Curated annotation (Swiss-Prot):
Protein family according to the UniProt entry: Belongs to the FlbT family.
InterPro entries per record: Flagellum_FlbT
Domain of life: Bacteria
GO MF assignments: mRNA 5'-UTR binding
Protein name per Swiss-Prot or TrEMBL: Probable flagellum biosynthesis repressor protein FlbT
TM regions (residue ranges): none
Entry keyword Membrane: no
Repressor as UniProt keyword: yes
Entries under NCBIfam families matching the protein: PRK00794.1-1
One BP term from GO: bacterial-type flagellum organization
A Pfam family assignment: FlbT
Length: 149
């Protein structure tokens, strides 16, 4: 990390830092002086909200940050999901971004990948609302992710 990172948390807010979950009891500012892997509570997707293919991919990717002990298993599931999504989506923008997201995760930049996945939600919503992806394909992806819920 080239510079320090400062974040503010509200009373009762949680943050996931290197796999640990912290809750603050008052408004607080944290300053990270070195490299750290963290995820803010408002970026954590709950299992019941992982109801589309990209949200399911996001859920898997966030587990890399939340549960570092299970990283290898999570990476295996992530790779399997990426391959499946690359074969299911036909939109060039999503396909290019999925390849970039895959490279980010492989290179240890899961936080950047989460941000990129969130950026694809509007495109995914359009595709799903216009039924550009077969319902059977969506169901197949849901079955693959089921063990992670």
């Amino acid at each position: 990390m080239k510079s320090t990172l400062r974040i503010s948390l509200k009373s009762g807010e949680r943050i996931f830092i290197n796999g640990a979950v912290l809750r603050v009891d008052r408004k607080v500012a944290l300053e990270f002086l070195n490299d750290v892997t963290f995820l803010l509570e408002n970026h954590v997707l709950q299992p019941e909200d992982a109801n589309t293919p990209l949200r399911q991919l996001y859920f898997i990717a966030q587990m890399i940050l939340i549960n570092p002990e299970g990283k290898e298993q999570t990476l295996t599931m992530f790779r399997k999901s990426i391959v499946m999504l690359l074969s299911c989506f036909q939109d060039d923008e999503i396909l290019a971004e999925l390849k970039r997201i895959d490279a980010q995760v492989v290179s240890g930049r899961a936080f950047d990948a989460l941000k990129a996945i969130r950026g694809l939600y509007p495109l995914e919503d359009r595709i799903l609302n216009n039924q550009e992806m077969a319902p059977a394909t969506i169901e197949q992806i849901r079955k693959e992710i089921a063990p992670w819920r």
